[in-house]
Amino acid sequence: MNINATILGQAIAFVLFVMFCMKFVWPPIMAAIEKRQKEIADGLSSAERAKKDLDLAQANATDQMKKAKVEAQVIIEQANKQKAQILDDAKAEAEQERNRIVTQAQAEIDAERKRAREELRKQVAMLAIAGAEKIIERSVDEAANSDIVDKLVAEL
């Protein structure tokens, strides 16, 4: 193998070219590659953070839904209790009103009964007086007296 000046010149040119590339071309390429690697790593970590945030948000949403369901159930139970209380109060009020009306009606019936008895007593007294007057008018005849008394008893 012959080593001549051309090969030696090419080797020196190649070494100079490699040194030039290592000094001026390679650092910007490496910087661009490192920058791209950093951007990819940042993107991956950002995606991982976003996934964790999403999982956390889903967990929070699930917890809030559970809490909302519990609160809704509590509100429904309170509404049912309030409804039952209102119904009980209305029933009690209606019962009191019924008792008041019955008591008032009973008092009116008693008053009417007393008035009717008093009226009946007055009529009986008037009939007794009328009967006594008739007996006195016909006091001579004993058979007529017993007949008048029988009629009075029949009228009473």
From Swiss-Prot:
Q: What is this protein called?
A: ATP synthase subunit b
Q: How does it assemble?
A: F-type ATPases have 2 components, F(1) - the catalytic core - and F(0) - the membrane proton channel. F(1) has five subunits: alpha(3), beta(3), gamma(1), delta(1), epsilon(1). F(0) has three main subunits: a(1), b(2) and c(10-14). The alpha and beta chains form an alternating ring which encloses part of the gamma chain. F(1) is attached to F(0) by a central stalk formed by the gamma and epsilon chains, while a peripheral stalk is formed by the delta and b chains.
> What role does this protein play?
F(1)F(0) ATP synthase produces ATP from ADP in the presence of a proton or sodium gradient. F-type ATPases consist of two structural domains, F(1) containing the extramembraneous catalytic core and F(0) containing the membrane proton channel, linked together by a central stalk and a peripheral stalk. During catalysis, ATP synthesis in the catalytic domain of F(1) is coupled via a rotary mechanism of the central stalk subunits to proton translocation. Component of the F(0) channel, it forms part of the peripheral stalk, linking F(1) to F(0).
Q: Where in the cell is it found?
A: Cell inner membrane
One GO MF term: proton-transporting ATPase activity, rotational mechanism
Query: Which NCBIfam families does its entry note?
Result: ATP_synt_b, PRK05759.1-2, PRK05759.1-4
Give the Gene3D superfamilies listed for this entry. 6.10.250.1580
Family named by the database record: Belongs to the ATPase B chain family.
Regions crossing the membrane: 11-31
Name the gene that codes for it: atpF
